[in-house]
From Swiss-Prot:
With S4 and S5 plays an important role in translational accuracy. Interacts with and stabilizes bases of the 16S rRNA that are involved in tRNA selection in the A site and with the mRNA backbone. Located at the interface of the 30S and 50S subunits, it traverses the body of the 30S subunit contacting proteins on the other side and probably holding the rRNA structure together. The combined cluster of proteins S8, S12 and S17 appears to hold together the shoulder and platform of the 30S subunit. The modification 3-methylthioaspartic acid is found at D89. This is Small ribosomal subunit protein uS12. Residues 9-28 are annotated as: Disordered. Belongs to the universal ribosomal protein uS12 family. It comes from Bdellovibrio bacteriovorus (strain ATCC 15356 / DSM 50701 / NCIMB 9529 / HD100). InterPro entries: NA-bd_OB-fold (IPR012340), Ribosomal_uS12 (IPR006032), Ribosomal_uS12_bac (IPR005679). Part of the 30S ribosomal subunit. Contacts proteins S8 and S17. May interact with IF1 in the 30S initiation complex. The lineage of its organism: Bacteria, Pseudomonadati, Bdellovibrionota, Bdellovibrionia, Bdellovibrionales. HAMAP family: Ribosomal_uS12_B. The keyword tRNA-binding applies.
């Protein structure tokens, strides 16, 4: 606890809360180009091959982002849209790629939660 003299000398500084997705620059989404598409393994209790992509954003940042859903058509130089949102068991992955926008197609045969995976309504 500071003394009164210490407070007179320099007043209290308000701590700014840091953003969890700095590469978005306060935007809801950002466009980028895939520089590498690969799989990686999650942290200790889990086991899988998670699909991720390294993306160079339009503002110059290079980030690792997660490709949600089953199957994808991404390759190097694909143009994608990035949103915030981390993957808890993949360290360093703080962004998601939006399905069904730009070069990334929606998930085929998806019937539930279609809007999250960019899938059109099936014909009856």
């Amino acid at each position: 606890m500071p003394t009164i003299n210490q407070l007179i000398k320099s007043e209290r500084t308000v701590q700014k809360n840091q953003t969890k997705s700095p590469a978005l620059d306060s935007c809801p989404q950002r466009r980028g180009v895939c520089t590498r598409v690969y799989t990686t393994t999650p942290k200790k209790p889990n086991s899988a091959l998670r699909k991720v992509a390294k993306v160079r954003l339009s503002n110059g940042f290079e980030v690792i982002s997660y490709i949600p859903g089953i199957g994808h058509n991404l390759q190097e130089h694909s143009v994608v849209l990035i949103r915030g949102g981390r993957v808890k068991d993949l360290p360093g992955v703080r962004y998601h790629i939006v399905r069904g926008v730009l070069d990334l197609q929606g998930v085929n045969g998806r019937l539930r939660a279609r809007s999250k995976y960019g899938t059109k309504r099936p014909k009856k």
